[in-house]
Amino acid sequence: VATRNMAMSRQKKLDKMEVIELAKEKPKPEFCFKEARAAGKVIFETDDLVIGYNKKPLSKPINLRMERGEKIAVTGTNGIGKTTFLKSVLGLIPAVSGKAVLGDYLYKGYFEQEIKPGNNTCIEEIWETFPSYTQYEVRSALAKCGLTTEHIESKVRVLSGGEQAKVRLCKLINVETNILLLDEPTNHLDIDAKDELKRALKEYKGAVLIVCHEPDFYEDLVDKVWNLEEYSLLA
């Protein structure tokens, strides 16, 4: 009876104790961009480039030039044409008029603002891009980008915006590049991931063209700022 009373007394004490949750696995990201050989002197140059969709212009003629190793932020209000400018430079959409001329020996890395994820798990997503990787290498690459085991084994579409961005950054950092074109890469990232991305971009020797609406992120990262409002037909 005494033993039973002691056990009940201990159980009451346990019931009163607050439940302490173990800290959830939260790996810190480590981004390190792989670098290709040096690009030619000129990365790209625009010649009276007018951007827009379906032949409807969004801008006045744009004449800009980017050189090897430069880091430039593209800014402006929403809807001004920042994404359109990036896609026009890359040749992914046609210019309304004028042109963008790309330089020599470019190894491009492009981070799109939004991509609709398919049905792949994170592992499958990376394996499709890097089929020669072992499963261990795929898992390690994803973990380095700050994803947990649970994330890594999940389908990309069920992840949060920040976690999906880390999967896409995982693809980007493991390809050799000498020019990065980044469209709002900080949009969904947590503070640790933002800080680490900024550190990695500062260390990167190639050119960086980044669309960003966060001055705190780009101000001490870039050499110059291109404000597309200066070229806007809406201004």
Predicted regions, residues:
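Long, charge-dense, solvent-exposed interaction surfaces that engage phosphate-rich ligands
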Residues: 10-11
